[in-house]
């Protein structure tokens, strides 16, 4: 199975993904049964250590690229992540990074902010054009908007 299929199967079993925003949250996460995490903390000097720790505990790890200082938001930044840090994938608001991530074998999750009807329309167009592996819809508590995307 490939990374995307593994992730989707896991998501079907455990519908929660933790959002780790500080090193303290990292330790708290490891005490839970949740299997997947979005990592929004760290920097280029510690991020591999964080990812390795999570993977040692058999967790699925996605890096929010824009939240990791020192990682460039381009093809070379994604190559670095894929070759040296080795997360399961990335989360990004930047559509340009989705294809780069997929080319490097990373699962690519597009984060969309659905704040008004224009954002919904633009988000749907982006998803059709870019074809990310999965979507994170923000704000998180918007069930009526989910029907429009699905």
Model features per residue range: what roles?
Residues 29, 94, 135:
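Conserved, mostly hydrophobic/aromatic
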Residues 18-30, 74-78, 118-128:
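Short, acidic/polar
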Residues 1-63, 69-71, 86-87:
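Conserved N-terminal beta1-alpha1 strand-loop-helix module at the mouth
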Residues 76-84, 88:
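Glycine-rich loop/turn
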Residues 41-57, 70-75, 92-106, 115-123, ...:
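Active-site-adjacent beta->alpha loops and helix N-cap segments on the catalytic face
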Residues 32, 84-85, 104, 129-130:
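Structural motif
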Residues 37-39, 110, 134-137:
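Short catalytic-loop micro-motif centered on adjacent basic/acidic residues
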């Amino acid at each position: 199975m490939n990374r995307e299929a593994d992730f989707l199967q896991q998501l079907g079993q455990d519908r929660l993904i933790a959002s780790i925003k500080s090193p303290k949250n990292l330790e708290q996460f490891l005490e839970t049964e949740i299997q997947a995490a979005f990592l929004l903390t760290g920097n280029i000097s510690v991020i591999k250590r964080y990812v390795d720790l999570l993977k040692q505990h058999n967790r699925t790890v996605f890096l929010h690229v824009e939240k990791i200082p020192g990682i460039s938001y381009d093809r070379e930044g994604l190559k670095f992540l894929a070759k040296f840090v080795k997360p399961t994938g990335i989360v990004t608001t930047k559509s340009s990074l989705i294809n780069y991530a997929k080319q490097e074998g990373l699962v690519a999750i597009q984060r969309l902010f659905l704040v008004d009807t224009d954002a919904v329309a633009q988000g749907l167009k982006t998803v059709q054009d870019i074809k990310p592996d999965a979507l994170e819809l923000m704000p998180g508590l918007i069930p009526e908007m989910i029907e429009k995307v699905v």
